Amino acid sequence: MSITRKIPLVLMLLSSLSFAQEVNGEKVFTDYCWGCHHQTSVAFGPSFQEIANKRTIGEIQGHIIAPKSTYKQLGHKRSVMPSFKDKLSQDELNAITKFIMSYKSKKDK
């Protein structure tokens, strides 16, 4: 096989590997969040819809990583949310944040 035929094949292979490694925010939700949060209604913790409508991406990520350091700044009296600093990769953190923000009301987008 000539080099001109190999290059497109290699590029296709690399792009498919990259696509396969994309982190799914809904999977992160089911793995870590669903026990306390629901997408649109209050469970033990606030709904993703409420969070998305009240918080910035930075506030959401900060609270996921260090809830004990951020809860007062966010107007809460206490937080029982565990830290996910050592549990989530940056890709997982970005994916769950994007998933949460997908519940933001259309009028607020």
Please give the residue ranges for each predicted region.
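Bacterial N-terminal signal peptides that target proteins for export
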Residues: 1-8
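Hydrophobic alpha-helical targeting segments used for export or membrane insertion
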Residues: 9-13
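Processing junctions and N-termini across compartments
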Residues: 14, 27-30, 75
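N-terminal signal peptide c-region/cleavage motif recognized by signal peptidases
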Residues: 15-20
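Gly/Gly-Pro-rich "capping" loops immediately C-terminal to redox-active cysteine motifs
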Residues: 26, 38-66
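Axial heme c-ligation environment in periplasmic c-type cytochrome domains
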Residues: 44-52, 67-109
